[in-house]
Amino acid sequence: MLDQKDNLLSSYNYDLPKDLIAQSPTRSRHDAKLMIIKDGLDDSLNLVHAKVWDIKDILKPADLLVVNNTRVVKARLKIRLSGGGAGELLIMEPRGDGRWLCLGRPARRMRGGDQLWLDTSRDNSLILKVIDKDEKTGGRIIQFSNEFTSWTEMENLLDLCGEVPLPPYIDKDRSSGHEENYQTRFASKPGAIAAPTAGLHLSDELIENLKIRGIRIAQITLHVGLGTFRPLEKEDLSQLHLHSEWIEVTEETIKAITTCKEEGGKVFAVGTTSVRALEAAYLSGRGALKPYEGKVNLVIKPGFKFSVIDGLLTNFHLPKSSLLLLVSALIGRNRMLKLYKHAISNKYRFFSYGDAMLITPESVI
């Protein structure tokens, strides 16, 4: 049952001590804490404290994990501005013919027609051109040379002179190893500018143990972009729109889901991006889960009816984020806030490198 507060952004706020923002992962990926939510009572704190490693003993042989196989690219580029000075581009997505949507800084000094210089070595530079402002995102359309038409070609350039685009709450000076730590073990398809962080918990050893126990793993692709990480701003959520992100749900994954359900298993999404991809594919199939490739901007908030997933492995998310809305759609906003307060009291670590929550099928409202 929805109440009016479910459509107010301020209803998804909470206070987090800064020292609970994880600056690096646990020593082993699967050593993170795991809060297991046990039932669907809105006022209940029926939960178990465990480790992510224990998930192998919680899931059953017929169950299925669905992971996101996107790979984070080194999308942050340092550039020189027309008229002098330094700037920065965050590569977002291809727009065809060597043009890319980018977030620029300082944006006020990137006007249509301006040239930018990207140093690819000590003696060589690429000349880029600002085409126009993108009104939907506030970003800039930047012209690269025509050889950079897709993420495959662009990644070669980014590997040469780009940096991993870490979230602003991670202090780059306090930790290292991000090129490896900020990728999941399934990362194979370039195109994300942020990691699907729940997947970071699955170590090679844990993956092998899951398979030995008969727990299957299927993959989707959602290139994490503005739709996932851009902060929400408008208080009224009734007309919320998110930036589109590219997804792919394959026939192979659909067969795995069908088999799982036929055998009485449960489908657990690993991360909110896997939820969005699967539920968007279902809606695009008009009531049937079919292969899908393209952009989606699905909003999942309280009142949403889930049709594919039964449970969710997810991290603890930022206040007032679309990810908190999705978690609230599964377990209720009031309960989500109580669980987050409990996590803070028990020193759970938050955000990208932080601990995890397992929302079990019996806890979904």
From Swiss-Prot:
Pathway: tRNA modification; tRNA-queuosine biosynthesis
GO molecular function, one term: S-adenosylmethionine:tRNA ribosyltransferase-isomerase activity
One term under GO cellular component: cytoplasm
Cellular location(s): Cytoplasm
GO biological process: queuosine biosynthetic process; tRNA wobble guanine modification
Keyword vocabulary terms for this entry: Cytoplasm, Queuosine biosynthesis, S-adenosyl-L-methionine, Transferase
Coiled-coil spans in chain: none
Domain of life: Bacteria
Record-listed E.C. numbers: 2.4.99.17
Annotated family: Belongs to the QueA family.
PANTHER family according to UniProt: S-ADENOSYLMETHIONINE:TRNA RIBOSYLTRANSFERASE-ISOMERASE (PTHR30307:SF0)
Function: Transfers and isomerizes the ribose moiety from AdoMet to the 7-aminomethyl group of 7-deazaguanine (preQ1-tRNA) to give epoxyqueuosine (oQ-tRNA).
Stated name of the protein: S-adenosylmethionine:tRNA ribosyltransferase-isomerase
Organism, as annotated: Prochlorococcus marinus (strain NATL1A)
